[in-house]
């Protein structure tokens, strides 16, 4: 009986930990940019979140991009309400933008700006299951 109680308690703690994961954490598919898209893994990095390219695809299928392992989302700090602020790297022009991310269930809306917010670009990513 005691072993069952311990096993139930451990399972409850493990499941609660998974349920408490931040909404931004996980694997996401980027929107196509210059004909290519990527799978990005978002994980905690200190008190913020970072997203690293783990797989890349183009019209011919999966390919070994030199961008694999590079960080797209940089130090995204939670702002509450599913919003995050940090920096976003755009591989197609190798520029870093001031970034804002909003998570709504399995959709990530991202906006990257330069020149104090005068020039902005946006993308919508979807969570991979």
Model-derived features with residue positions:
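Sec/Tat signal peptide C-region and signal peptidase I cleavage site
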Residues: 15-21
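Positively charged n-region of N-terminal signal peptides that target proteins for export
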Residues: 1-4
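Cleavable N-terminal signal peptides
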Residues: 8-9, 19
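Short, exposed beta-strand-loop hairpins at the edges of beta-sheets
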Residues: 97-121
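Short, solvent-exposed mixed-charge patches
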Residues: 128-129
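Central antiparallel beta-sheet cores of small beta-barrel/beta-sandwich binding domains
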Residues: 24-97
């Amino acid at each position: 009986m005691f072993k069952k109680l311990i096993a139930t308690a451990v399972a409850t703690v493990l499941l609660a930990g998974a349920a408490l994961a931040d909404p931004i954490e996980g694997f996401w598919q980027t929107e196509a940019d210059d004909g290519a898209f990527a799978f990005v893994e978002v994980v905690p990095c200190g008190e913020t979140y970072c997203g690293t390219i783990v797989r890349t695809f183009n019209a011919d299928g999966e390919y070994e991009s030199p961008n694999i392992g590079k960080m797209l989302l940089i130090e995204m700090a939670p702002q509450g309400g599913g919003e995050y602020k940090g920096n976003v790297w755009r591989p197609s022009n190798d520029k870093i933008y001031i970034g804002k991310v909003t998570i709504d269930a399995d959709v990530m809306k991202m906006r990257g700006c330069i020149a104090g917010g005068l020039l902005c670009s946006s993308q919508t990513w979807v969570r991979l299951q």
